[in-house]
């Protein structure tokens, strides 16, 4: 029988869920409006331990949660109503699963008797995320189900979790209590009597021990591993892994450190950051082919040339270091995968290689490319690579950088400048989609309030126009730099059979500008077509307490023609 008690118990379960998630380390909850999720929404509204973020579009909401989780290194909860609202989270959940980002989806759902019978807004929600989330299906709230069961279910699903969890929450009507009391979890409630101790504490009901993070080789194995010519590769690494320790490791062993755009070390002067270009430099490539052992930190490398190098080289020893058990080696050459924090592994008792400094000439080649890029990009024609290098050199210690997919992140990987300091860098390179990039950047910016720059292509921004609504709510600097080359011009770099096919089926020129979109959301907007204007607008935007848009207008072929010219110079070096 549906009574006021149903609404009260629904709300109590919602409050238990939100309270336990807060105790499990959740700091942020992202919410979209909807009726069936009312018990969760009202509980979140009363929960003082969580920072609330609201958005009307679940796709953008999911990506905002992804950004918050990346920036906070903590799980983030997402509340949605039933039906396609849940399905709209799928792209963000896929990205989070592939990159080990813990998102906790709390989806409101119809009770069992309203499923599969034509009831409104009712779909099969359990397992909707298939391979990309751990699934928990909660029953409808019932006074005969002990509240301890609810808490232990949450604890087992969420504790130590590094990937998405989907908690499906069925609720019967009525969903709205006649009044909202000051305290939902009232210790005087008979239903909560078994939780008296828990209510007086601040810890989870069940505490799970931390999983052992570090596996490491023996000293003898290390001695044998470093006995020869080797390279160290820094792939995707989070700031929490303290990638700077890899610089010290490289210097101790005497092997070069080759750095990916996502390593936090791409611009470090002691690293070989221009590895993508060096692998088409004849002398550098010949030298690198002498290596017979490799130590890879992280995975998901950007450079196809570096990926091919790892696949084609005849390695005597191939070690990879990952923070969790995973398979992130498309070459299938890795023979030992160690589960450890990068910094911890780098601080083991390493020995100097018997072939220390074998590749020191790479430093000269890397420096030569640095000077080439200064002459031909910084001092050359206005374009996308020039803007990206200018961003990377502007106030790096003051800000964080989110680099969009497709062409922007590749240009950064190929041509980022050498710098004494680097902004903390984020990407979405799990599934490498061009959706949700602005929303992710908004989440990153919202966590600490640190100035944030987003570099995004025009098609990516068209995908995520709704997230301008999230951006306008920010109170810290978010500079949205849209590189508008009128279409998907990364396809200029790919062997499409002819120009007509490229234009009609791949590039999809649109002729659109973003000024009216920015105005619709009341965001400051500038359009630039030269470096001086860009730098003026960019520095002003970094000081503006909120989001702003800089649209960089470039020709369709500027980047691809510049890349071709630089490739030719490098190959002839």
From Swiss-Prot:
Keywords: Magnesium, Manganese, Menaquinone biosynthesis, Metal-binding, Thiamine pyrophosphate, Transferase. Binds 1 thiamine pyrophosphate per subunit. Belongs to the TPP enzyme family. MenD subfamily. One of its GO terms (biological process) is menaquinone biosynthetic process. Catalyzes the thiamine diphosphate-dependent decarboxylation of 2-oxoglutarate and the subsequent addition of the resulting succinic semialdehyde-thiamine pyrophosphate anion to isochorismate to yield 2-succinyl-5-enolpyruvyl-6-hydroxy-3-cyclohexene-1-carboxylate (SEPHCHC). HAMAP family: MenD. The keyword Transferase applies. InterPro entries: DHS-like_NAD/FAD-binding_dom, MenaQ_synth_MenD, MenD_middle, THDP-binding, Thiamin_PyroP_enz_TPP-bd_dom, TPP_enzyme_TPP-bd. Transmembrane segments: none annotated. It comes from Shewanella oneidensis (strain ATCC 700550 / JCM 31522 / CIP 106686 / LMG 19005 / NCIMB 14063 / MR-1). One of its GO terms (molecular function) is thiamine pyrophosphate binding. It catalyses: isochorismate + 2-oxoglutarate + H(+) = 5-enolpyruvoyl-6-hydroxy-2-succinyl-cyclohex-3-ene-1-carboxylate + CO2. Pfam families: TPP_enzyme_C (PF02775), TPP_enzyme_M_2 (PF16582), TPP_enzyme_N (PF02776). This is 2-succinyl-5-enolpyruvyl-6-hydroxy-3-cyclohexene-1-carboxylate synthase. Its cofactor is Mg(2+); Mn(2+); thiamine diphosphate.
């Amino acid at each position: 029988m549906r009574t006021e008690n149903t609404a009260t118990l629904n709300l109590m379960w919602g409050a238990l869920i939100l309270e336990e998630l807060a105790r499990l380390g959740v700091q942020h909850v992202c919410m979209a409006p909807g009726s069936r999720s009312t018990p969760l929404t009202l509980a979140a509204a009363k929960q003082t331990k969580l920072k609330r973020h609201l958005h009307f579009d679940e796709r953008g909401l999911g990506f905002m949660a992804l950004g918050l989780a990346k920036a906070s290194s903590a799980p983030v909860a997402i509340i949605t109503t039933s039906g396609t609202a849940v399905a709209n989270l799928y792209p963000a959940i896929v990205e989070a699963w592939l990159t080990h980002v813990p998102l906790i989806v709390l989806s409101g759902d119809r009770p069992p008797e309203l499923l599969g019978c034509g009831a409104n807004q009712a779909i099969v929600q359990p397992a909707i995320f298939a391979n990309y989330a751990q699934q928990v299906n909660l029953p409808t709230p019932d006074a005969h189900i002990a509240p301890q069961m609810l808490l232990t279910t949450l604890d087992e699903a969420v504790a130590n979790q590094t990937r998405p969890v989907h908690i499906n929450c069925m609720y019967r009507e009525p969903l709205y209590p006649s009044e909202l009391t000051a305290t939902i979890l009232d210790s005087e409630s008979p239903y909560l009597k078994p939780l008296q101790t828990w209510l007086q504490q601040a810890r989870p009901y069940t505490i799970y021990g931390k999983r052992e993070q570090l596996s490491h080789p023996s000293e003898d194995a290390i001695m044998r591993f470093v006995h020869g010519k080797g390279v160290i590769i820094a792939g995707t690494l989070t700031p929490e892994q303290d990638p700077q320790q890899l610089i010290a490791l490289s210097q101790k062993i005497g092997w070069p450190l080759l750095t990916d755009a996502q390593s936090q070390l791409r611009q470090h002067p002691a690293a070989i950051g221009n590895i993508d270009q060096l692998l088409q430099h004849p002398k550098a490539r010949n030298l690198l082919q002498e290596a017979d052992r490799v130590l890879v930190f992280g995975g998901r490398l950007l450079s196809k040339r570096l990926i091919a190098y790892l696949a084609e080289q005849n390695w005597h020893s191939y070690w990879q270091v990952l923070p969790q058990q995973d398979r992130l080696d498309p070459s299938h050459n890795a023979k030992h995968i160690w589960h450890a924090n990068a910094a911890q592994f780098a601080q083991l008792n390493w020995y100097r290689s018997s072939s220390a400094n074998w590749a020191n000439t790479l430093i000269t080649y890397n420096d030569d490319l640095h000077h080439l890029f200064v002459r031909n990009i910084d001092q050359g024609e206005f374009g996308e690579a020039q803007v990206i290098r200018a961003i990377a050199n502007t106030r790096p210690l003051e800000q964080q950088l989110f680099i969009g997919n497709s062409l922007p992140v590749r240009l950064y990987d190929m041509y980022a400048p050498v710098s004494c300091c680097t902004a903390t860098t984020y990407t979405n390179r799990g599934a490498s989609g061009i959706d949700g990039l602005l929303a992710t950047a908004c989440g990153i910016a919202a966590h600490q309030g640190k100035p944030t720059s987003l570099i995004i292509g025009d098609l990516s921004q068209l995908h995520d126009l709704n997230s301008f609504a999230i951006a306008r709510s920010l109170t810290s600097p978010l500079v949205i730099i849209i590189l508008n080359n009128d279409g998907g011009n990364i396809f200029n770099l790919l062997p499409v059979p002819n120009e007509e096919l490229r234009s009609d089926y791949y590039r999809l020129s649109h002729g659109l500008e973003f000024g009216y979109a920015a105005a619709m959301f009341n965001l400051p907007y500038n359009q630039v077509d030269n470096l001086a204007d860009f730098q003026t607008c960019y520095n002003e935007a970094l000081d503006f307490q909120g989001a702003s848009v800089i649209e960089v207008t470039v020709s369709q072929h500027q980047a691809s023609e510049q890349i071709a010219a630089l490739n030719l110079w490098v190959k002839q070096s």
